[in-house]
């Protein structure tokens, strides 16, 4: 079985999402199905069919999260030190052309979220900076074209 790297924070978020689906969302969907069933003829009961569709979606999401959690390997980022980019590192990058500064945390596919500044280790930026050190220049192939960045800092912190 393949193991998928994930930070402790990411693992906890997935567990919380699963718990909410199992304890709150699923029971309410099951109740909606039962209530719609009481309305009579199921062949023409739009409420029933909609509730069943929602139930299937929720059950699928629960199975997906259970599988993700079973395949997850929690990496304790707080144990890492140094100036080399590793999984879980927060990396400060300077665009060599525009001089703009970006900070990203390198995380697993299960927890990447660009809005939170978390990018996947398998993304173009993640691949380009992995195992590089502070001060190194990296060229990254992005959809918008090649960009050159300097690694200004590497930090390991457990959020």
Curated annotation (Swiss-Prot):
Coiled-coil region list: 45-67
Pfam families referenced in this protein's UniProt entry, alphabetically: GreA_GreB, GreA_GreB_N
Gene Ontology molecular function terms on file: DNA binding; RNA polymerase binding
Keywords carried by this UniProt record: Coiled coil, DNA-binding, Transcription, Transcription regulation
GO BP: DNA-templated transcription elongation; regulation of DNA-templated transcription elongation
InterPro entries xrefs: GreA/GreB_C_sf, TF_GreA/GreB_CS, Tscrpt_elong_fac_GreA, Tscrpt_elong_fac_GreA/B, Tscrpt_elong_fac_GreA/B_C, Tscrpt_elong_fac_GreA/B_fam, Tscrpt_elong_fac_GreA/B_N, Tscrpt_elong_fac_GreA/B_N_sf
Top-level taxon of the source organism: Bacteria
Keyword Coiled coil: yes
Protein family according to the UniProt entry: Belongs to the GreA/GreB family.
Record-linked PANTHER family: TRANSCRIPTION ELONGATION FACTOR GREA
Function statement: Necessary for efficient RNA polymerase transcription elongation past template-encoded arresting sites. The arresting sites in DNA have the property of trapping a certain fraction of elongating RNA polymerases that pass through, resulting in locked ternary complexes. Cleavage of the nascent transcript by cleavage factors such as GreA or GreB allows the resumption of elongation from the new 3'terminus. GreA releases sequences of 2 to 3 nucleotides.
Protein's recorded name: Transcription elongation factor GreA
């Amino acid at each position: 079985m393949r193991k998928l790297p994930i930070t402790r924070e990411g693992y906890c978020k997935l567990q919380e999402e699963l718990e909410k689906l199992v304890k709150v969302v699923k029971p309410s969907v099951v109740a909606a199905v039962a209530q719609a069933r009481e309305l009579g003829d199921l062949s023409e009961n739009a409420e029933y069919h909609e509730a069943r569709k929602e139930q299937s979606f929720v059950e699928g999401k629960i199975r997906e999260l259970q599988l993700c959690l079973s395949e997850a390997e929690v990496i304790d980022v707080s144990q890492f030190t140094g100036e080399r980019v590793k999984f879980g590192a927060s990396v400060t990058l300077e665009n060599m052309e525009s001089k703009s500064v970006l900070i990203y945390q390198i995380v697993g596919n299960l927890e990447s979220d660009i809005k939170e500044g978390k990018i996947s280790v398998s993304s173009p930026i993640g691949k380009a900076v992995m195992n590089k050190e502070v001060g190194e220049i990296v060229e990254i192939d992005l959809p918008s074209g090649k960009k050159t960045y300097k690694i200004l800092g590497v930090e390991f912190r457990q959020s």
